[in-house]
């Protein structure tokens, strides 16, 4: 519970009407003020008069940490050697904003490498440096002092009084009263898995990678545990081609240290990757799993969940995902997928495939949760961006705590403990001592928010007839309804909660807990380990039986019938109309969408019913509808990340609803619709004005707009003026050059700018401009220039060969110059690409340029 700060009540004489500081404060040369610990304190921030404090109070439960953020503002002149001390019978760790000279020194990538560097664009106020002495505060600047209080499990409840003393060299000291109230209960352990990804080889090089001292690794794990985490990602695991496995780095080294640090909880699952029992084949898979589970039971370890392909695209990575996870289907090991966008959430939530879906922040929705419950799947959340939003701790606290609680998630993870600018800890040069960022401290606050609300819900469950149970239930329901739909990376001070409301919620929860009486961990409320259901009751039965099953009286049968039709794929085409009719049934809707998607173009009779769902209030349902429409109008030809769609005879049917999806407020849905529309060709021309408008929007939408215009090619001719304006004259964005090339002769207005770029640039940029010129004006000289560049001494060979591949048969006149290169060692690194080009020429193919979605 954050401190309540009492303002100084003394009457202050102000020198003049415009000055806010008293003569005494000016004489001292500084003031000490409070800043909410959910908000970043920038070096140049100047506090208001009402922020100056004389007393700091903080309230926390036993075995809880709580932070206080103070600021010291230099007024008049600068300050030197500012010393902070705390007198308290409770432990208080003092941090200050990272020293500017140290921050500047750590900005040298050449010296400290990608994992040790602190990039210059990351603000200093993010990094907390352990220590009680600040060297210098320039006149008009401030420094933040971050005090982290810890009440041990055996702390005496009640008031603990102390002092905070701030004293710059040669200046009078400022002494603040410190009052810490310890609540008479200890919070329960969280029942959700709170973790972050950490790999030894992603830490600063001076720590030693996988050879770092055990003391260092133990300190890292202890830091995670002290910040509220109870789970971890273990990598690498080992090799299971013999039992017991050899070189099992995680079992032999990492896990014992994590146990020693108190990071892992036997009841909370952890993740494993990089050599798992499922890597073997056939019967050996079961033998390896049996050995592994016996070993983890013997050692009292938690459940290990297999970490599947990371952030897979859908549908492009479908084959990769199924190859990776299918060997574990039907085994006792659960599997996990990190889903970076809503398309993947829809695409990989199918029977028996994945048990734990860890979904990127903001993509968890009520319909996702409802479908996961029907399937027996678990939903967790993760983020790699939330701490960077304004660099305030507030989004971190919200994401870890209230977001996890609102959606009743099984886990909450962040990338990463330390990885480039995705870090939650940092290290001083040559030091092995981790130090936190403010977001890490905020994350711990969020985990504690979750623990308070979890404990209160347990009180109601234990005492349903208590006089306060109805009031508590109503309050919790109201709070949850208020928070549903808030995007974690978009939360700000005041939306959906003001900073003060976080502590008001916690205070109210604690007050209610006091009325019930604190209860210990509720053993019957720990989450059960469940696998995603197979829902196979109709598997293999005739299509007509499955169609009849769609009308069964029980939900399980209707769902099983739809999933059986999904497994039939195109052979289930006779069921298209029947599947369309059940899309109105929320319990069967998602299996029916999957079945229609697998049927493909022959599901066209269901388009009117599918089209209704692009207006659904939940983006999970909307993305499913858009992807099904895509398979009907422009089915995927190859399940790879570069796999293309090809328009079907039914393409025109899906354009209108996909344009609705293109306007979807959920940006990944808009992006997905754009990628489909671009494949449809002329019928999708009505999307061009929207795509043109998107060029003026932020990155995600401008990328979608460029994608449509590129893939529609000549059908997007109306976009040429806007593309030239978007390219800002010099066409430095290669994506714009490619869009103009795809449009072709209708982009003649771009010739002067492209000519200038081809003359002023070298390498890939020059090749793109020359390629575009040839596409637009079809002059042999442009093609020859491309070939001459390839033969030149400084050629970007891969780029030029890729451009020749895109031209295919249009470049047949240079085949005689290209073919001898296959015999040249100087071109051995592009022989495969040259063969591909010649193959296109022989087949009469002109692949063209496609947008990299």
Q: Which residues does each PLM region occupy?
A:
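An acidic-aromatic substrate-binding cleft motif
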Residues: 174-275, 302-305
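Extended acidic/polar, glycine-enriched regions
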Residues: 73-82, 134-190
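Surface-exposed binding patches on compact interaction domains or structured appendages
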Residues: 20-52, 76-147
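Amphipathic alpha-helical scaffolding segments comprising HEAT/armadillo-like alpha-solenoid repeats
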Residues: 537-549, 570-583, 602-614, 635-661, ...
């Amino acid at each position: 519970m954050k401190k309540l700060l009492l303002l100084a009540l003394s009457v202050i004489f102000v020198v003049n009407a415009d000055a806010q500081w008293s003569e005494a404060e000016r004489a001292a040369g500084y003031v000490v003020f409070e800043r909410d610990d959910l908000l970043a304190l920038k070096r140049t921030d100047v506090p208001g008069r009402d922020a100056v404090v004389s007393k700091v109070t903080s309230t926390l439960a036993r075995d809880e940490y709580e932070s206080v953020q103070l600021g010291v503002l230099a007024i008049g002149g600068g300050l030197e050697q500012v010393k902070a001390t705390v007198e308290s019978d409770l432990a208080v760790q003092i941090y200050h904003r990272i020293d500017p000279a140290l921050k500047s020194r750590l900005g040298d990538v050449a010296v400290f490498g990608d994992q040790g560097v602190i990039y210059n664009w990351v603000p200093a106020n993010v990094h907390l440096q352990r220590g009680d002495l600040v060297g210098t505060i320039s006149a008009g600047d401030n420094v933040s002092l971050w005090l982290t209080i810890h009440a041990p499990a055996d702390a005496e409840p009640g008031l603990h009084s102390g002092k905070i003393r701030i004293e710059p060299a040669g200046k009078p000291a400022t002494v603040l009263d410190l009052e810490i109230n310890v609540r008479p209960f200890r919070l329960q352990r969280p029942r959700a898995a709170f973790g972050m990804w950490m790999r030894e080889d992603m830490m600063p090089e001076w720590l030693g990678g996988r050879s770092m001292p055990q003391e260092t690794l133990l300190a890292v794990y202890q830091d995670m545990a002290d910040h509220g985490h109870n789970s971890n990602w273990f990598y690498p695991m080992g090799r299971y081609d013999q039992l017991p496995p050899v070189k099992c780095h995680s079992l032999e080294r990492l896990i014992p240290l994590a146990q020693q640090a108190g990071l892992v909880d036997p009841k909370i699952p952890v993740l494993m990757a990089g050599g798992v029992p499922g890597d073997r084949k056939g019967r050996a898979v079961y033998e390896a799993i049996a050995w592994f589970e016996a070993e983890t039971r013997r050692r009292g370890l938690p459940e290990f969940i297999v970490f599947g392909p990371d952030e897979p695209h859908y549908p492009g990575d479908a084959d990769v995902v199924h190859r990776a996870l299918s060997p574990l289907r039907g085994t006792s090991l659960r599997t996990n997928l990190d889903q970076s966008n809503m398309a993947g959430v829809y695409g990989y939530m199918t029977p028996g495939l994945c048990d734990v879906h860890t979904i990127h922040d903001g993509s968890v929705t009520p319909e996702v949760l409802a479908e996961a419950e029907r399937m027996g799947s678990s939903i967790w959340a993760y983020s790699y961006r939330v701490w960077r939003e304004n660099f305030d701790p507030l989004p971190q606290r919200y994401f870890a705590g209230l977001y996890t609680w609102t959606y009743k998630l099984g886990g909450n993870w962040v990338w990463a403990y330390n990885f480039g600018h995705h870090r939650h800890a940092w290290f001083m040069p040559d030091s092995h001592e981790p130090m936190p960022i403010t977001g890490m401290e905020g994350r711990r606050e969020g985990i504690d928010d979750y623990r308070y609300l979890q404990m209160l819900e347990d009180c109601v469950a234990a005492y349903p007839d208590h006089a306060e149970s109805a009031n508590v239930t109503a309050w919790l329901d109201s709070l949850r309804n208020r928070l549903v739909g808030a995007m974690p990376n978009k939360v700000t001070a005041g939306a959906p909660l003001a900073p003060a409301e976080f502590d008001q919620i916690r205070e109210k929860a604690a007050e209610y807990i006091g009325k019930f009486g604190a209860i210990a961990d509720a053993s019957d409320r720990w989450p059960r380990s469940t696998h995603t259901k197979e829902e196979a009751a109709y598997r293999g039965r005739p299509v007509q039986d499955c169609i009849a099953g769609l009308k069964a009286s029980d939900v399980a049968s209707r769902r099983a019938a739809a999933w059986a039709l999904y497994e039939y794929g195109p052979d289930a085409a006779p069921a298209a109309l029947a599947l369309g009719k059940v899309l109105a049934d929320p319990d069967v809707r998602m299996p029916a969408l999957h079945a229609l998607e697998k049927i493909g173009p022959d599901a066209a009779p269901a388009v009117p019913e599918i089209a209704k769902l692009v207006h659904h209030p939940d983006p999970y349902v909307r993305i499913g509808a858009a992807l099904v429409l895509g398979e009907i109008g422009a089915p995927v030809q190859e399940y790879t990340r570069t796999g293309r769609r090809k328009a079907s005879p039914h393409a025109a049917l899906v354009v209108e609803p996909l344009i609705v999806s293109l306007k979807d407020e959920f940006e990944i849905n808009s992006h997905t619709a754009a990628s489909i529309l671009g494949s449809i060709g002329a019928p999708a021309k009505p999307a061009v004005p929207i795509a043109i408008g998107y060029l003026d929007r932020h990155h995600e939408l401008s990328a979608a707009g460029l994608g449509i215009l590129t893939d529609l090619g000549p059908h997007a001719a109306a976009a040429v003026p806007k593309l030239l304006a978007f390219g800002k004259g010099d066409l430095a964005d290669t994506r714009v050059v490619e869009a103009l090339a795809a449009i072709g002769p209708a982009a003649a207005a771009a010739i002067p700018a492209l000519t200038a770029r081809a003359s002023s640039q070298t390498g890939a940029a020059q090749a793109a401009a020359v390629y575009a010129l040839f596409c637009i004006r079809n002059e042999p000289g442009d093609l020859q220039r491309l070939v001459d560049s390839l033969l030149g001494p400084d050629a970007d060979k891969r780029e030029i060969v890729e451009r020749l591949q895109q031209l295919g048969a249009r470049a047949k006149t240079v085949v005689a110059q290209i073919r001898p290169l296959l015999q040249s060692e100087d071109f051995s690194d592009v022989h495969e690409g040259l063969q591909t080009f010649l193959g296109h020429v022989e087949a009469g193919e002109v692949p063209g340029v496609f947008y990299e979605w």
